[in-house]
Amino acid sequence: MNTTSLSAWRSLAAAGYIAVLLVACGQSDQAGDEPSAMDRAAAKVPVTTTSDEARDLYMQGRALFDNLRFVDANNLFAQAVEADEDFAMGYFMVATTSQTAAEIFDATSMANERAASASEGEQLYISALVAASENDQSAQLDALERLVAMFPQDERTYVQLGTFFFGQQDFSGAVERSSQAIEINPKYAGAYNLLGYAHRNLDDLDSALVAFEEYVALIPDEANPYDSLAELQMEMGNYDASIETYRKALEINPYFALSYQGITINHSLKGEPELAQEAADQMLAAARNFAERQAAMFRVVTSHLFAGNTEAAMEISEVMMAEASVEGNHVAMGGTAEYMGDIMMVAGDTIKAEEYFNAALDHRLQADINEANKAQAARVHLFKTSIAAMIADDAEAAASRAAEYQAAAEVHGTAFEKRRVNELSAYLAMFSEENEAAAALFDSASQFDPIVLYWSAVVNKDLGNMDKARQLASRAANRNTLNANLPFFRADAMKLLEELSAE
């Protein structure tokens, strides 16, 4: 069994450790007509800088950031802080658009050091960023709720809070906050993107489609609206339509990496490995920096895994490791080593898997990240090696590591990590043939991980819950299409679904 690992680019993920989209402050460029521009500006979080040049660069960068053009936006935010070295929100946006962990943590520190000279609203944005960097979700939520209360007419504050809820898998909360943002400013396109994803994860695909179509209508000359719509089409199994919509995004912006990724996955889901590889190669050719090259090579890896070619997947992973080593990027090396461990674990080589998991932890402990993230890396290591021990039939080690993980996650873990406690407990129950307990625990684990869904389907089948097993197997095989775990068990999930449909 394998669980989450190297995260793929997502249409709601900004960069690095930030699990939710952090929305820049200031008056919206897409404001409606009422009330007056002066009244609306007074209702927004201000942008504090002594430099008109820095402000102009910031606003240009924010417009690009809104449309997920992170590389281009980062260049402008970097210029903004050159124009005003005390520009706290400029550093905030450098952090949210940076491509490496070292740059992210450095810019976060710079923003925090300059926060005292910023407005109270900007300070709350920065407090939320710092809390996110330290995995302190309680403090992050507190800052965001105070931000919304202080600026109840700023649509961006609602999207900020809504995206936090999205990251917590509170999709109803995300729908509520994005809808409030739209009430304030019906022309704020980013709110429709969040609304569409939240509806999708609530299985309200019709409402998701309406939101994404409105998103396209508002900014038809940007790539991301088409990318979001294409992802929904892929989730709905409309693979050919999805590919065409992704191509529309690439016609607008040939460097929009997310869309190459989507085309690659579509072809893999259609059982077209050569076309999947071709799209991944195109993604690699379009890469403009180290992070984009790594993301592209990762999709080469997953296309090989979808095709059942473990050897080729490991070979490309070694190339990723070599390039990351040249860059001295221990975060990237840690992520790749972890995924290589996942590959080996699914292949049944638990000794090799643990070697890679150990290497992943070593790299992360050497990385330019804070102590909270290093502690989280140690928890990830416990989680992974617990599962490896189960597969190796080392019940004592599995139970000991799982107990240690649970104790650490319950005190220091994020909401995601706490769901993983239930996942580990479900695996332990399943290996002990306590299927009723396993089924209940799987229900409390992440419902967006194909691995959890697959094993939950297996357990429910064994319990005779055929309708639920079919539903779970279908979701395991056909949903969460960007999830890095999907290649590992999709073929098994498809086979299980076929068996269940025949009964």
Q: Which residues does each predicted region cover?
A:
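C-terminal motif of bacterial Sec signal peptides marking the signal peptidase cleavage site
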Residues: 22-24
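Alpha-helical segment of the N-proximal tetratricopeptide repeat
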Residues: 50-79, 83, 123-138, 142, ...
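Short coil turns that delineate tetratricopeptide repeat
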Residues: 51, 85, 116-119, 152, ...
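Canonical positions in the second alpha-helix
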Residues: 79-80, 110-114, 146-147, 180-181, ...
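Helix-start (N-cap) detector for alpha-helical repeat units in TPR-like alpha-solenoids
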Residues: 54, 88-89, 121, 155-156, ...
